Amino acid sequence: MTNIIQEIEQEQLKENIPHFRPGDTVEVKVWVIEGSKKRLQSFEGIVISIKNRSLNSSFTVRKVSNGEGIERVFQTHSYSIDSIFVKRKGKVRKAKLYYLRTRTGKSARIKERIE
C-alpha cells in the first residue's frame, strides 16, 4: 500500500527546483488566475523557513513593501509555481529566521555568502 503512495508522490515531484537555503533572496514566479485571464506574478524576498516533507514541502518568503512586512508560504512542488530564481545567497546561522519579523532597517540585513 505504501509503495503505491510513494510511486504517485514521485511522479508529482518537480525536478527543476534550484537549491536554496534560509537567508537566500529568491524570486518566485507564480501563475495567478483573475477571471478568465492567467498571468505570471513575481514575488521576491528572503527565505525565512523551509519545511522538507517530500511532496508536501514548503518554504516561506518575506519581503517589506511600503514599510509593511509581507510573508507568503509556497508549496515547493505546486503547479502554480512557474519558476524559482536565487538572486542572492545569505549567510545565516539559523534554520528559521523568524526574528526578522521584529527587525527593521539595518538590523534586518543579511550578509552575503560567498562560495
From Swiss-Prot:
This protein is located at the 30S-50S ribosomal subunit interface and may play a role in the structure and function of the aminoacyl-tRNA binding site. PROSITE patterns: RIBOSOMAL_L19. GO terms for cellular component: cytosolic large ribosomal subunit. The keyword DNA-binding does not apply. InterPro entries: Ribosomal_bL19 (IPR001857), Ribosomal_bL19_CS (IPR018257), Ribosomal_bL19_sf (IPR038657), Translation_prot_SH3-like_sf (IPR008991). Belongs to the bacterial ribosomal protein bL19 family. GO terms for biological process: translation. It comes from Buchnera aphidicola subsp. Schizaphis graminum (strain Sg). Keywords: Ribonucleoprotein, Ribosomal protein. One of its GO terms (molecular function) is structural constituent of ribosome. This is Large ribosomal subunit protein bL19. The keyword Ribosomal protein applies.
